[in-house]
Amino acid sequence: MDILRCTNLTKTYGRGGGMITALDHVSLSLERGSFTAVVGASGSGKSTLLHLLGGVDRPTEGSIYIEDTDISTLTLEQLAIFRRRKVGIVYQFYNLIPTLNVRKNILLPILLDGEKPDEARFEKLAATLGLSDRLT
């Protein structure tokens, strides 16, 4: 089963003679449980593709399905909720909030969604990652 699928994904910036096409009708699908690397030269559209697939930016054309939801048709509010619940992006340079401790930075998406964290699961995850002594 495809966990992620995009069809005819196009992203352009600018207009008229200054228009740049960053992605030109890209289609792909990823199966649940698969691992995929996106590689290419600088300026080849890797970051643009990942931003679109993660719902950080909107395509000029095409559709993006995560599970059975076409995220390219969601309102900004619906997309924000969907991203908090279903999408995780790890950037090359992490973007932690310096006024929050490690625990709160990790739990932030759950707290923003109004959910109560599963403390036992969180503690196990922190221990697995070797972060238990850095949480506060």
Give the predicted meaning of each segment.
Residues 62-70:
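Conserved ABC transporter NBD signature motif
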Residues 17-20, 71-88:
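ABC ATPase NBD coupling module
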Residues 39-41:
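The feature captures the beta-strand-to-loop junction immediately N-terminal to the Walker
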Residues 98-109:
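Short coil-to-helix segment of the ABC ATPase nucleotide-binding domain corresponding to the Q-loop/switch region
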Residues 69-70, 117-134:
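Conserved ABC ATPase "signature" region
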Residues 1-6, 12-25:
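A short, flexible loop at the N-terminus of ABC-type nucleotide-binding domains that lies
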